[in-house]
């Protein structure tokens, strides 16, 4: 474990972005985080289950619905117009209330997951759709305030810990600023051609983001063009998730975001874990970028993939049985396929 951090070095690492983190063995630099070591429980926990569930599941049209519904010609775009109306009037904000979770039963689900052999459980925290599934203090777009009107993350956490399972949360928020750019577009053809989608309404900017008028329409999976204000908002929001739900694992959908903001968040996660475990870091952070995890720092995650050779450090693969968000009439992976994957990976 890392030794004591000089006060001047600690202050310099945090002052760059004006970020406050839990004091402990780490500061928000790559050099400091190299001292991180993966906890033994994660090495031994070979199988976990993830509930990739949120408001985009409500239409039952598969993954990325909140983005695809604004892409003219996409099946989700057509389905949305048929079942909700034109995107200039009825957008994703109007889909959210249909996500009610009337039959949500985390206790029953966790019993099933435990019987299946899962040693840890993941709850969705927030997807690219900018909707928090916890009692978030940084946005009104959360599951306690609307939709199910339940603390989904909190209820899942309670059920998992009750059964001795480790608890994880996933965050996909960082890219939301760019991902939702299509909601500021308009139809190119038809009776609504040129009529802006509902993302351009200032009343909805806290969901769809207040994008500059000249913001590039082409989506790219990076942080180019993302303002510091959004980076700070991301840090504050995910820190709120960490502080209130103390996850054993925090998963980011992509690489570690926004350099000093992301590094400070990971340092905060590890330091808070050390505070709660007598100086021992029991938390795990995952990144999909190999370079992030080359020396300590975090656990490498492969989405729908796996390592090409035996690795000295533990890694994780995440995959789904069908579509990431629920999709009606889709073929699921067979039990044999799932078992073969587990045998191959574990």
Regions found by a protein language model. Give the residues of each.
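Mature catalytic domains of secreted/periplasmic carbohydrate-active enzymes
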Residues: 12-346
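N-terminal export signals
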Residues: 1-14
């Amino acid at each position: 474990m890392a030794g004591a951090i000089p006060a001047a070095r600690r202050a310099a690492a945090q002052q760059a972005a004006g970020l406050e983190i839990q004091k402990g063995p780490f500061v928000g630099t790559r050099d400091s985080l190299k001292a991180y070591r993966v906890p033994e429980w994660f090495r031994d926990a070979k199988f976990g289950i993830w509930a990739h569930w949120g408001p985009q599941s409500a239409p039952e049209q598969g993954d990325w619905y909140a983005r695809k519904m604004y892409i003219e010609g996409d099946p989700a775009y057509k389905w949305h117009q048929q079942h909700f109306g034109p995107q200039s009037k009825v957008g994703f904000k109007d889909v959210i209330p249909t996500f009610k979770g009337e039959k949500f039963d985390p206790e029953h689900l966790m019993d099933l997951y435990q019987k299946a052999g899962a040693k840890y459980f993941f709850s969705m925290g927030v997807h690219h759709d900018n909707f928090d599934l916890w009692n978030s203090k940084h946005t009104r777009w959360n599951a306690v305030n609307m939709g199910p009107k339940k603390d989904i993350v909190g209820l899942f956490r309670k059920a998992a810990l009750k059964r001795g399972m480790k608890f994880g949360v996933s965050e996909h928020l960082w890219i939301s600023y760019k991902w939702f750019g299509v909601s500021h577009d308009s139809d190119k053809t038809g009776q609504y051609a040129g009529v802006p989608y509902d993302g351009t309404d200032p009343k909805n900017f806290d969901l769809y983001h207040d994008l500059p008028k000249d913001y590039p329409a082409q989506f790219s999976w990076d942080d180019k063009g993302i303002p510091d204000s959004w980076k700070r908002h991301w840090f504050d929001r995910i820190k709120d998730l960490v502080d209130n739900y103390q996850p054993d694992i925090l998963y980011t959908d992509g690489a570690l975001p926004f350099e000093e903001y992301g590094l400070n968040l990971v340092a905060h996660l590890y330091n808070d874990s050390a505070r709660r475990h007598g100086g021992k870091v029991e938390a795990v952070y995952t990144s999909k970028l190999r370079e992030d995890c080359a020396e300590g720092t975090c656990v490498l995650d492969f989405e729908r993939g796996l390592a090409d050779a035996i690795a000295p450090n533990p890694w994780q693969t995440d995959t789904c049985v069908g579509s990431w968000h629920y999709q009606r009439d889709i073929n699921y992976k067979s039990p044999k396929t799932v078992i073969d994957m587990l045998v191959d990976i574990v």
